[in-house]
Structures are given as C-alpha cells and as structure tokens.
UniProtKB/Swiss-Prot annotation:
Tissue and organ distribution: Highly expressed in the panicles.
Binding locations of ATP: 572-579
A GO CC term attached to the entry: chromosome
Effect of loss of the gene: Normal vegetative growth but severe reduction in fertility due to a decrease in chiasma frequency at metaphase I of meiosis.
Annotated signal peptide: none
Organism: Oryza sativa subsp. japonica (Rice)
Protein name: DNA mismatch repair protein MSH5
Stated family: Belongs to the DNA mismatch repair MutS family.
The entry's keywords: ATP-binding, Chromosome, DNA-binding, Meiosis, Nucleotide-binding, Nucleus
Pfam families: MutS_III, MutS_V
Keyword Electron transport: no
InterPro entries per record: DNA_mismatch_repair_MutS/MSH (IPR017261), DNA_mismatch_repair_MutS_C (IPR000432), DNA_mismatch_repair_MutS_core (IPR007696), DNA_mismatch_repair_MutS_sf (IPR036187), MutS (IPR045076), P-loop_NTPase (IPR027417)
Length: 809
C-alpha cells in the first residue's frame, strides 16, 4: 500500500466517529448508531436479561466501537453502568444523558419522516416515505424508532451530520443508507473470545509520546488481510467482527474463492486493478467540503479509480473463458452478472463528465493551480490568458513607467511593477527605500510595506498600479473563484450518481475481500470447509492458523464431535499443545463462518451460534481477578450455550484451592451432560483427580483425550520426555512439570529440590530440610551437644568441664 493510500486510510480512521443511542423499555433495548465514515445509520432491537450484565449490549459496543453513547436521563442505573463499561483494551465511550423527551416516540417518528436517504426519490409523500423507510428498518419496533429518531435529533442539534437541506415542515437529514442488523444472523464472539483466539491484535505506535497510528499486529485478521483497498480492509474487518450463519452466503463466498483459485491469472489482474480503487464516497465528501481544497492529484486519483472500476468488467469479459464460464454456472456463481449490475454505464458517464471539465495536467504545464479544461468557459479562458501573459505585460508597463520618472535611480536592480495575490499591483524597489527628498518629486507614490529576505524590497502604490487594480483586479483569485464555481457544479452533478458509485465501490470491496481470502488459502494450503445445518464438527489434520507460521513443523490433529462424545476432556503435560489444540478447533469454526478456507485437510463444520471462551483473560483493564473472569465466562456459558454452541475451557478451576477447582470443574461438566444434546465442549485441565474420584457422571457425551508424550520411565515425571503433540484417546496422570521447568530455564538447584520434595511426598516420608553449609555446621554442633548431654552423668560428672566442652569459648 503506497503512502497516498495509507494517508487516505488514516484520514478515514480519524474521520470515523460512531455515535450511538440506546433506549430500554422492560427487557427490550433499542439501539441506533451512526457511522460518519460510511454515512450509514444502523438500527437493531435486542432482548436483555436484566438479571445479567447486559452481554448483548457489550457485544454491540465491541462491534461498533462508539465514541459517544446517548441515552435518557431516566435510564436504569444498571444499564448506565453497562454502557460506561469498557471492553478489554478499548477506551470506554463517553456516555451523555439527554432529556427523556428527546427519545419520545412522537418526536422520534416525526424526525424519521424527514430523514433523507441517498436513494430516496424527491417529492415523496409522507405515506411513501413510510413505505420506503419500512423497507430498510422495522418501524413497528417502538424502541428502535425511539433510538433512531432520538439519535438523528441529537446529531442535528450538535451539527454532527454533514448535509442539512431545508424541506417543507423541517430539516431533512441526509445519510447514505439505513441498515437493520440482527444478532441472530451472526456467530457471536465477545471481546474475551476475540482476545483469547487472537482474532485481532492492535500494536500501539512505539513513539514515547504515543504519537502515531496503531497497526494490526500478529493476529488472524492481520494474516488473512491481503486487501489492496481501504474499503476492502474495512469490510474484511466487519466480516471478522460479524461472522455469519447464513449457509447460502457462506457457500457463495466459498464458491467464489474456489473459482479464483482455478484462474490465478484473472485473480492477479483483478488485484492489480483494485490497487487503484479508492474510497469514492470519502473522496466526494472531501470534494464537497467547503473547507478542503481539491488538487489535480485528487481528481487524477478519482478518474483512475473510475477507470479501474470499469476495467474490472473488462477483465471478467476477456479473462473468463468459455470453460471458466461453464464452471461459474456449475458453481451457481453469477459473478459477471453481479459485476455488470454493480459497475454500470453511469460510471462511464461520470468519467466523461469529469474529463470534460477537469484537465489534471494543466496545473503542471502552466505552473499554477488551475484545473478547468480550456474551451469550457470563454470568460475564464480570457482571464487565464491575461494572467499567464501578465509577467511580460507588467515588465513592459514597468519600463514605460520608469522612463516617465523625472529623475533616474542609481540602483543595482531596476524597479519593477509586480502583482501580489490578494493585495494587487505594486511598484517594487530593491535594496533601498526611496528617500523623502525624492518622494517630493513623486506625489502619486505611497509607501505600502517592506519585505526582508536575500534582498530587501520596498513596495509602493502609484497612479499606474491603482489603474491596474481597477482594470485587472485580483485576477488570480478571480480565476480561482470561477474555477471553484465550475468544479462545485461538477461535484454536484457527480454526487447525483453517489448510489451507483457506492454500489460499485462496495462490489470492489467485497471482491477485494474474496481475493484476499483466496490468496491466503493458496499460500497456506487451506481447504474448503463443508457447512452443514447439523450440529457436528469433523476436522481432519486441523492446524492452528497462527502457530503453524511460527514453527518449522506443526503436528496436525483430528477432531470428531457428533451426537455422542460432545464433551471432550483433554489432559496432558504442560507444553504439550492442549491450549493450541482447542484454539485451533475454534479458529477453524470461526474461519468457516466468515466464508474462508480453513487450515486442515478436510473439515465439516456445523453452523454455530456462539463461541464461548473461558481461557484466563489477561486484560489489565479488568478490576476482577483471572479466576473471577473465568467464573463470569463460565456462568454466561452455562446460561446461554445451546447445542449449536462451541465452548472452550482452558484450565478452569486452577485459580483457587484444588478441592474447590475440582468441584467447580466437575459440576460444570455434569451440567453439560444434563443436556439432551450438549454444546460442543473442549476442555483442557490438569485436575486429573476428577477421573480418580466420583466427580464425573457416566455419560456417552464425555470423551477423554490426552496429548501424547514419549517417556522412558512411565512411573515418574522427572525424566527427559519428548512431546509428540498428538491428540490420542486416554487420560494423562502425570504433568511432567519438572521437565517443563527445565525447558523454561528454571535453575537446576530449584528443580532438584522439587525432585526431593516429590520423592518424599510419594514415599509418605517427612519432607527433608534443604542442606546448607552454615545450617549443616549448626546441625552438627547441636548433634554433638545432644550426644554429650546424653553421655553426661549428673551424679559423678564435672559440671564445669561439661559446660566448657559444650560451649567452648
């Protein structure tokens, strides 16, 4: 990505502000938020259990990243706390309380009636407006209407929206589109799950002052993001934040990836063309802003973007052979048709429109800021011709003026009439100011100002310069004003095609995402998963998408979860790969739901509604201990998990007393076995006592696995072992903690002491005290004293000699 694209992406991120409104009535919560970078209004309604900590609101906040949240002054305190709460490392949004009347149904409804959407025809009646809006959002949801209308009123009052047009009956707020979202359509992952699975990883800028833009670190998103457009990156992030459970949409993405993997020349040509595609709505926003100045480079980029979009259609027409066309038809992909319907002839018209007005090379050729093409406006052409010939004209006028002076000037450089922007025409003298004596002979001279530099300059108004001011005026800014008026008219005409341009850019962004996923699938040897409505999970030789990038050899593992064996308990030593295994399974499921190929030899993935993670979050912003965070996650898991959910528990119970941990772990597993069809559970633990005691019920749902190791002595865990990283049926009763300590670089004397303590415990002997030289000398001294005391005869012995022997001076 070049510097210009990075700057555009940076500007978009800086400009991107998300403003949210939230209204609660009973258990129903209406949410609306406006994304300033996309000019879109999103609305949704959710149902929350008031006895919990509002997990769905946390999920919406995490996905939308609002900077400000507006709510009523009558909002319940529990909801306020949920709105103010921050997620992981994200900064908490500012929560502003507004008058409750702002969110009244009547005012909100009236506000929505005057909402102007980009695709809405002019002159619609109120009834027609209602029908149009109802096609984009559910106007029957009162909390949704109150949130959306209240937010529009707030944005209008605080002047946060860009376009305000006056209509009969009030102001019309213009946005590009309204979109209703439903959490039921997505695979849900909260911030904790994203952190545990390393979906995103933001690396702060290393500047000491914190100046600079953060970048994506080593993460799943960072690895799969090969997008070449800023819109593609933004859309791909949205796909990662909102994995879908619509099997038709997923299969369409997978089919398209499969097709591109069969025609790499087409894929390469498309990616090369997409590199020139920019964020046209963002560019038009800049063109339309009165505070910004558009350069020839901006218009050149705009034209190049339009041409690149049109070229996409040509690539499909030329690059897709008859054989590939049959393949597309067999895969049920209407890629060419979608491209033709998205990138329409209107873009040709827009290109011709701009080319007919803008000459991007004129400024470079003429040496000043000028954009409008010659021959478009006769008056403008005349002004520009005068301005371009002005230096020669002023030189001639200066010579005539100097010749008319009543005396001659003895100076290194002859005086000259110059044109200064916004000031006018002035007679310039170099090096020295005209003396008062000479000024007497020049009654029409009036000193204006002086300028310091390599050579001093003194400027004067004269009769001739005043005539030039009246005759020519500030000609340069006349040219700029005329050009800006022409360009403003051009922008208005181009903006009439914003819906078509946006549709084309959105198609390019989606195409960019698909190509990015195809590139990664080819580079990393991913395979196409099979999605099914059945709640099963079968993975052959699955791999961890990130871990395999960091090691020379990665050992893959299988996963098979059907109607039985849905609760997998995994034991094994530290460092044996338990956590990596359960994470890799979750990542395969996650990637399948964004429509990506997956790191495995084959995969059958049942549609999943939610991924729960209780894996010991390490967030420093949480006020709770790691164990309390795990308890909270497990509690949410037990309340909301369904047969379609995937639950990950890594070392649950280790943060408290062993007995309590075993009890909590056993109770959690028992709870899952009570389901007719439990969720898919992957659980790793070192609490192997649950197998030796009666902590677990007898159930067909439970299967035990272990990570295999090669150990010379099966009875001890202090020998050298070889980790095989292979998942096999069974249970591991040894943790090989001493070997792991050696691998971690723990000092050998500490490890040796641990061996001694463990040996005493296994032999049920008192634990021997450590032997230190000073301590051993004192022990010997005490032993000698005791020996002498036992040998001393209190009746016949010499007490003085005894004390001298025991306590020598």
């Amino acid at each position: 990505m070049d510097e210009e694209e990075e700057e555009e992406m940076s500007e978009r991120e800086v400009d991107s502000q998300v403003h949210m409104a939230c209204v609660m009535q009973g258990r129903r919560v209406g949410i609306a938020y406006y994304d300033s970078s996309m000019h879109q209004l999103f609305v949704l309604e959710i149902w929350e259990d008031i006895t919990e900590d509002f997990p769905l609101i946390d999920l919406v906040k995490y996905q939308s990243k609002p900077s400000t949240i507006y709510t009523s002054t009558k909002t319940d305190e529990a909801l306020l706390l949920a709105l103010q709460r921050n997620d992981c490392n994200d900064e908490a949004p500012a929560v502003k309380l507004m008058k409750s009347s702002t969110f009244s149904y009547e005012q909100a409804w009236h506000r929505l009636m005057y909402l102007k959407v980009a695709a809405m025809d002019e002159g619609l009646s109120v009834k027609e407006r209602i029908c149009f809006l109802n096609s984009m959002m559910d106007l029957g949801s009162d909390v949704q209407v109150r949130a959306a209308g209240g937010l529009l009123a707030i944005l209008d009052n605080e002047r946060l929206l860009d376009t305000l047009d006056q209509m009969e009956g009030g102001a019309s707020i213009a946005i590009d589109s309204v979109a209703q979202i439903s959490l039921d359509k997505f695979l849900k992952l909260d911030a904790t799950a994203h952190e545990a699975l390393q979906i995103f990883q933001v690396d702060k800028h290393p500047s000491y002052m914190g100046i600079g833009r953060a970048k994506e670190g080593f993460s799943v998103f960072g690895m799969l993001n090969k997008c070449v457009t800023p819109m593609g990156k933004h859309l791909l992030r949205t796909w990662f934040l909102r994995p879908i459970i619509d099997i038709d949409v997923i299969n369409n993405r997978l089919n398209t990836i499969s097709f591109f993997l069969c025609c790499e020349d087409v894929m390469s040509a498309l990616r090369g063309t997409l590199k020139s595609v920019r964020d046209i709505p963002h560019m038009l926003k800049k063109f339309n802003s009165p505070s910004s100045f558009c350069t020839s480079s901006d218009w050149h980029a705009f034209l190049k973007c339009i041409c690149s979009l049109l070229h996409i259609n040509k690539i499909f027409e030329v690059g897709i052979s008859e054989h590939l066309a049959i393949k597309l038809q067999h895969m049920n992909i209407d890629l060419v048709g979608k491209a033709n319907s998205s990138i329409t002839e209107e873009l040709d018209y827009v290109s011709d429109l701009v080319v007919g007005v803008i000459d991007v090379q004129r400024g470079k050729e003429k040496g000043y800021d000028t954009l409008v093409k010659d021959g478009l406006c006769e008056e403008l052409d005349e002004l520009r011709m005068v301005y371009e010939e002005l230096p020669d004209f002023l030189e001639q006028v200066s010579a005539n003026e100097i010749a008319s002076f009543p005396f001659s000037f003895e100076c290194r450089k002859a005086p000259l009439i110059v044109y200064v922007h916004q000031i006018g025409y002035l007679m310039c003298f170099f090096d020295e100011k005209i003396s008062d004596a000479l000024l007497i002979g020049l009654p029409d001279f009036e000193f204006a100002f002086s300028e310091e530099g390599e050579e001093r300059r003194f400027y004067y108004h004269t009769q001739k310069t005043r005539e030039l001011d009246n005759l020519l005026g500030d000609i340069y800014h006349k040219i700029l004003d005329m050009e800006r008026a022409i360009i403003r008219d051009l922008v208005c005409r181009v903006c009439q095609f914003i819906p078509q341009l946006t549709k084309a850019v959105n198609f390019a962004a989606e195409l960019d995402c698909i190509l990015s996923l195809a590139i990664v699938a080819r580079q990393n040897n991913y395979v196409r998963p099979i999605l099914t409505e059945d709640s099963i999970l079968e993975i052959q030789n699955g791999r961890h998408a990130l871990q395999e990038m960091t090691v020379d050899t990665f050992v893959p593992n299988d996963t098979k979860i059907r109607s039985s064996g849905r609760i997998n308990i995994i034991t094994g030593p530290n460092y044996s790969g338990k956590s990596i295994y359960i994470k890799q399974v979750a990542l395969v499921v996650f990637l399948a739901h964004i429509g990506s190929f997956v790191p495995a030899d084959s995969a059958i993935v049942g549609l999943t509604d939610r991924i729960f993670c209780a894996m010991g979050s390490k967030s420093m912003t949480s006020e709770q201990s790691t164990f309390m965070i795990d308890l909270h996650q497990v509690g949410t898991m037990l309340r909301h998990a369904t047969s379609r959910s995937l639950c990950l528990l890594d070392e649950f119970g280790k943060g408290t007393l062993t007995e309590d941990g075993i009890g909590l772990l056993g109770g959690t597993i028992s709870h899952f076995t009570d389901y007719d069809c439990p969720p898919k559970v992957l659980l790793s633990t070192h609490l192997t006592q649950i197998f030796t005691e009666s902590y677990l019920p007898q159930s067909e749902h439970i299967k035990c696995y272990t990570m295999s190791v090669l150990n010379p002595d099966e009875q001890t865990d202090n020998e050298d072992v070889i980790f095989l990283y292979r998942l096999v049926p069974g249970q591991a009763l040894l943790s090989f903690g001493l070997h792991c300590a050696q691998l971690a670089g723990v000092p050998s004397e500490v490890v040796q002491r641990a061996v001694t303590v463990l040996g005493d415990i296994h032999s049920k002997r008192p634990i021997r005290r450590m032997v230190w030289e000073k301590l051993a000398a004192k022990d010997q001294q005490y032993q000698d004293a005791v020996t002498k005391l036992l040998a001393f005869d209190p009746h016949k012995g010499d007490l003085v000699n005894f004390f001298q022997e025991v306590f020598p001076s």
